[in-house]
């Protein structure tokens, strides 16, 4: 169980695959997708709900992630902990994760156990039972998770502060795991109310992948998910960001930091919102600007100037409401962070002024495609890409058309995207520095 931080690297590669899925809907509104993959006698079930941390009420940060934990605590027919014990007993694996726009649950098991995992997951869609006896101890588990993963990690603390600075009004600015003071106040009643409000078949997508058939999946989906009644689910109405007129800067010093690092994160359009014409060029821009040892930033700052140990760029366009574009660099031991920042700013300005060669753009597109082809072989790649698309405003058709749209990107479009997004007033610069022990 985990809160999910969107990774530009994970989903940039995953979404490029073509999975040839087949889909249908049940009468209660549940969308079902089947991705046949007969390479091994394995089946995977993923259930994606269109609800995440950005759908929480003010003062209840962390509730979506907390509820994810609580779905393993028993139903009217399954005792606390029995869900995962059953999956383990049949030789399978299960887990779940939460992000700003979704909560997802998955199991992987032998293909002949598909009915077992579908029966278990369908049961907790509508039969969850929560009492203080299980909720309050699990709240302590989440509090400890926050302490260990965020409060004891300087890098995680910095990321949290960056998001708070980047989003002036939108709930993407609060942590998925929640603020410590608000987690402490979450109750059994909060969790049950959130569950009843958002966990419904008409607010979910079921994805089955592996050594399965559409006919069998349809039969099992009708048997176990079909009887669950639909509910009225609230519209996802969220506050918008005001115009960003001033660059922001976050500096964190900590005795546990060994080497300094510098990064800058820009607010950007996403696949679902904003200037969507820029999203595919932004994927290519991230690759050509900072996607590896042949990229411009690495070549200029690490190889030619020799002042950095690493440098790169990334794009995360998966948000329902906003995306992000980032650049980063770390100095060599003993290097000066201000010198590094000046060099990065110079290289970004030079890239926008000079543009990119068509050969560089073509190489970047080929690298993205090669990564995508490799990612497609995994059984989880398709469910990840399609599930995330469903919860964040895209369609199966968008996922399937991804390689073609990347291939069509031109150098002119990449430059237009760079000029539109790499605006310092819409950015947060973050610096992580060592601090001498007192």
Feature annotation, model-predicted:
Residues 16-41:
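N- or domain-start disorder-to-order transition segments that initiate the globular core
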Residues 15-18, 243-245:
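Short solvent-exposed loop/turn micro-motifs enriched in small/polar/acidic residues
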Residues 20-21, 132, 249:
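Short, acidic/polar N-cap/turn motifs at the starts of alpha helices
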Residues 3-4, 40-42, 100-102, 157, ...:
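Short, solvent-exposed loop/turn segments at the edges of secondary structure
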Residues 147, 164, 233-294:
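His/Glu-based metal-binding/catalytic segments typifying zinc-dependent metallopeptidases
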Residues 1-13:
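Bacterial N-terminal signal peptides
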Residues 25, 82-234, 304-305, 309-438:
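Charge-rich, well-structured scaffold segments of protease-associated domains
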Residues 29, 38-87, 264, 275-289, ...:
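Active/ligand-binding-proximal structured segments within catalytic/core domains
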